[in-house]
């Protein structure tokens, strides 16, 4: 008898297998050319043949993604701490964080690439801009969500601001921070890919976005789909790893993680 946990893994795999089978059948029965829509088997063959070059490019994109995520976590967390310490500072600077978030990165990436001469750093800045806001926003909310009764109790016992931050505000904000981190993981990958599209540079330090552009120009559509598959798989792995980290950190004391463990 398959339990709920088994179905959580099995059901998506069955749906995916059914989708791929229908896709393969449709391409073969309708004789669709591979430069319009390749069959999954053609994509798998391209992934096998072009695997070394695609994986090398994926490593470049992944390096930018992880660096941007780490920078977003550190800088975003620090900004949230500053906001929690000063309401005036939050009211003054938070609107500009919103502006950065809602401005399409594809519109400002060319300027960043021009202003920042070092290519890796320019791509890192673009990915960071996309990734940092969920961490700032969520962590700020978490730091400001400490229970008022507990805050009053800390004041009653003469706790210093540092003690209140360490023993009350930070534990309260941790689930919010981890939720923002899960969101930012995917956004960092998106930002890195968009920045690579705009930069459009080849060479040894070529990211996966350039491989997609190159495949599109050459009508190597199976290779394009193979690169897209690697990007999607990378995004899923990043999310699952961050979700696992969140559950590991919270499972012994936070209700959300404890409830998930019991299911």
Language model region names:
Residues 7-29:
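N-terminal signal-anchor transmembrane alpha helix
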Residues 138-177, 212:
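Short cytoplasmic-facing helical segments at TM-TM junctions of multi-pass membrane proteins
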Residues 2-3, 29-73, 210:
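Periplasmic/extracellular loop-to-transmembrane helix junction in inner-membrane transport proteins
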Residues 207-244:
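Hydrophobic alpha-helical transmembrane segments of polytopic membrane proteins
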Residues 125-129, 162-195:
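Transmembrane alpha-helices
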Residues 246-263:
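Short cytosolic juxtamembrane segments of multi-pass membrane proteins
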Residues 67-97:
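Transmembrane-helix boundary motif in ABC transporter permease subunits
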Residues 98-134, 141-142:
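Generic hydrophobic transmembrane alpha-helix motif, especially the helices
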